[in-house]
Amino acid sequence: MKTLLLLFFIFTQFPILPQKHLEELNKLLNDAYKMDLFSGVVLFADKDNVQFLKTYGYSDWESQTTNLTDTKFNIGSIGKLFTQILIAQLIQEEKLNLTDNLKQIYPLYNNGYDEKITIKHLLTFSAGLGDYFMIEDFEMHPDDYRSTEALLSIIKKQPLLFEPGTSTEYSNSSYVVLGGIIEKLTGKTYLENLKERILNPLTMNNSGFIYKDSKRINTAKGFIVNPDGTKESTYERMPNVPTPAGGMFSTAEDLLKLDRSLMNDNVLLNDEHKVLLLNRFNSDIKMSFAELLSKPDFGMGVAGGSPGWNAVYDQNVGNKYTVIVLSNIDNGAEVLIDRINSILREKKYPPLKMNTGRFIYEIVKEKGVDDFLDNYKDYLSGYMIEHDGLLNRIGYQFLNKGMTDEAIAVFIINTKYFPDIANTYDSLGEAYMLKGDNKLALENYKKSLKMNPQNKNAEMRIVELMEKEN
């Protein structure tokens, strides 16, 4: 039986939310926790005070260590905001211009790219760079690339995805290049700049880079919720290498310090360059900081995540409040943020739904294989099946428990959703083979191999099955 953990940290000096909002927030967050959709911390502050600060679940589900308000969470790509602030500071100091290209300030390529890529391109994902996470050498040996220089050594070998300035594509690599520019212009490492220019001035003492071999004090571990409801740590298998593109750790209260500085003082940036930052480096927008804050629809939302982690910092300038949600469960923050905003604005919002994988797993168990195969479209009408990996993972959860018929049912549905993906037939072939149905196993392995002639597993299984037939 799962124990419900609600560690309620509201101090007497905090003004109290309207009772209606408080009750709705509590119900939403309690339900999300019970449904394994959320574990972490939620902070809500108006322009003057923190009004709601509450933690849920465990920082380590294996050791049952509870989340606290000062537990550090991986904030993923929210780290890009810190890089943007550092770049804005250098522009403010007249060490850099948005129109500067790499050839002028940071020669990186030897193939003509340097003349085409500007600072603004890098900031706005329009430089044509891709994602270093997709580079095989980084994926295999992430700890070899802790320094910006080391990362750039593999990034610069990658071809551009498009001509700079002609399109946009989310790019972690672009922000590593920005980190390299920061290091060159200041003569200090990115982390030194982060500490000296942002973290220390704002006394963000619970924020910074944490590596796998770092001493971890009051630091959460990321977890994914498996289709069967078990929780699996991503700590050992995920490359936690913080960079200028993201991956730093922070707390909700530390992020609020950043928020307060951006909205209320000039410790980090003067008003002119805060406008530049908050308008996403669109220098064509001409307005004062006061005019920007007076816009009723203005706000800034940034999010970050990776398997086992999710974070949202949502600054609602027009409504004069800030919401910060940090989670050490997949998608936990993004599931909640729109619903929290709806409660605070007294708007309707959709009810929470069980995680897609959990829902399908439970439906197959509850309704049985035949019913699921006959009615899967109705059951899944409220869910998006975006990629074959989801159903594949559910199928293997059943297969690993010896529930072969259930696995086959899920794999069959996967071939219906993704008939052009060779791996769906490979998995179905494996399930039939384990059941002892060699004919259907062979049929599906052959189909998989025809679609993907490089599938060595299917090739090997076909040989095995044909030998058995003979």
What are these regions (language model features)?
Residues K20-E23, N74-I78, Q92-M134, K157, ...:
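Active-site helix/loop module of the DD-peptidase/beta-lactamase fold
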Residues Q19-K54, E183-K188, E192-E196, N200, ...:
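Catalytic loop of the DD-peptidase/beta-lactamase superfamily, centered on the K-T-G motif
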Residues F133-R216, P242-L256:
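Catalytic-site signature segments of enzymes, centered on catalytic residues
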Residues Y33-V41, S63-T124, F162-S171, T243-G246, ...:
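Short active-site loop at a secondary-structure junction
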Residues L81, D388, T404, A422-N423, ...:
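Helix-start (N-cap) detector for alpha-helical repeat units in TPR-like alpha-solenoids
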